[in-house]
């Protein structure tokens, strides 16, 4: 088999928008959102290392990453202005890993499985308001067959998202009042059937949410 190793670095830069610097907006007469002309640009440093292995019809890739974001632009409550104001927050560190495996067979059958883990490093004392789910996984099973004037394809896609523990603000006038909440894990499935009945004529039937998943709460 063939094995390869890659490393990369990328730097990011985002200047504050005119909206973030100068907008004054009435949020449904509940509170005001104010721009901040003193905002600093967001910068980021992104590191990744990946390994790939290929042998015949099989492929495996593993990637690790570490990202640092400085001066992230967000909103915070201003007691002086009695409203929210755009501001910069201290650096955020995000790390994680991804794994992808795939196989393709001569009979037309193929499969792909992927998994990702993400961790956001929150400084002690700061509320954990991220809704990023730490574990996600996807799976795809596909059968594809071609003839002279006809082609047939059926694919089953599934996506799993783990539960996430986070905090929600409980007050419109304070960024110190939060409550801990847990959003449950769930899985979604989609089935797609495609047929090429003639040159330039395709028919596709798709069923989203195959098993009729309904969340216990909306957020």
Q: Where are the predicted features?
A:
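Outer-membrane beta-barrel signature, preferentially recognizing the C-terminal barrel domain
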Residues: 2, 11-69, 79-104, 131-135, ...
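Repeated loop/turn-to-beta-strand initiation elements of outer-membrane beta-barrel proteins
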Residues: 2-5, 57-60, 107-111, 147-153, ...
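Short, glycine/charged-rich beta-strand-loop motifs at protein surfaces that mediate ligand recognition
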Residues: 3, 63, 174-183, 189-194, ...
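Hydrophobic alpha-helical packing residues
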Residues: 5-7, 18, 141
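Transmembrane beta-barrel domains of outer membrane proteins
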Residues: 10, 50-54, 100-104, 114, ...
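C-terminal beta-signal and adjacent terminal beta-strands/loops
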Residues: 14, 70, 160-170, 194-219
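Outer-membrane beta-barrel translocator domains and adjoining extracellular loop/strand segments
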Residues: 19-24, 31-32, 72-80, 118-128, ...
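Gram-negative outer-membrane beta-barrel transporters
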Residues: 65-69, 86-167
């Amino acid at each position: 088999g063939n094995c390869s190793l890659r490393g990369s670095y990328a730097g990011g830069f985002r200047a504050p928008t005119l909206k973030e610097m100068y907008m004054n907006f009435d949020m449904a007469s509940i509170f005001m959102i104010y721009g901040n002309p003193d905002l600093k640009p967001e910068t980021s440093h992104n590191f990744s290392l990946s390994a790939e292995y290929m042998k015949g019809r099989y492929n495996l890739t593993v990637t690790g990453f570490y990202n640092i974001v400085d001066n992230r632009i967000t909103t915070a409550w201003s007691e002086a202005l009695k409203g929210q104001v755009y501001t910069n927050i201290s650096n955020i560190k995000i790390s994680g890993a991804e794994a992808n495996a795939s196989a393709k067979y001569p009979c037309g059958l193929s499969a792909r499985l992927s998994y990702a883990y993400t961790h956001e490093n929150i400084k002690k004392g700061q509320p954990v308001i991220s809704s990023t789910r730490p574990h996600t996984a996807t799976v795809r099973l596909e059968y594809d067959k071609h003839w002279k004037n006809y082609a047939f394809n059926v694919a089953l896609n599934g996506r799993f998202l783990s539960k996430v523990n986070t905090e929600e603000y409980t007050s419109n006038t304070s960024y110190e009042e939060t409550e801990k909440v847990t959003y449950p894990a769930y899985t979604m499935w989609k089935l797609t059937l495609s047929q090429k009945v003639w040159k330039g004529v395709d028919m596709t039937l798709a069923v989203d949410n195959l098993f009729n998943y309904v969340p216990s709460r909306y957020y």
